Amino acid sequence: MEKTITAHCLVKNEGRFVWYAVMSVINHVNKVLFWDTGSTDKTQEVAWEIKKAFPTKIDFLEYGPVDVQTFTKARQKMLDATNTDWFIVLDGDEIWWEESIEQVVHLIKSSKGG
């Protein structure tokens, strides 16, 4: 059975780079949890544009502001919402090289563990 992968993208004010970050993994993962923590820039607009283009792959949530204590709770909620075998953390300004994401996905899909 093929292993499935979710990308966790928990962001705030990453409108300048987040499109590139998500696009760098979108064709290699089954789902992207794209949660915004109170952006005041164009991050949410970018998220909705990506969701329009990939409606079944993007789960966008306006999570709301987090602080040092509640950041870990948001991450845990992302884990709880993940229904795939694996997940990767994707920062809002993290752009994967094609070869790198292909290598990671290959390792995941060829691993014996779930």
Residue ranges and their predicted role:
Residues P65-A81:
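Glycine-rich, basic loop-to-helix element that forms the pyrophosphate-binding segment
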Residues C9-F34:
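Short, well-formed alpha-helical segments that are part of the catalytic scaffolds
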Residues D91-I95:
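The conserved acidic donor/metal-binding loop of glycosyltransferases
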Residues F87:
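Short aromatic/hydrophobic "clamp" motif used to bind/position activated sugar donors
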Residues E49-P55:
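Short, conserved SAM-binding/catalytic segment
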Residues E99-G114:
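Conserved donor NDP-sugar-binding/catalytic core segment of glycosyltransferases
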Residues W35-E49, P65:
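A conserved acidic beta->alpha catalytic loop
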Residues E2-T6:
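Extreme N-terminal starter segment of soluble prokaryotic enzymes
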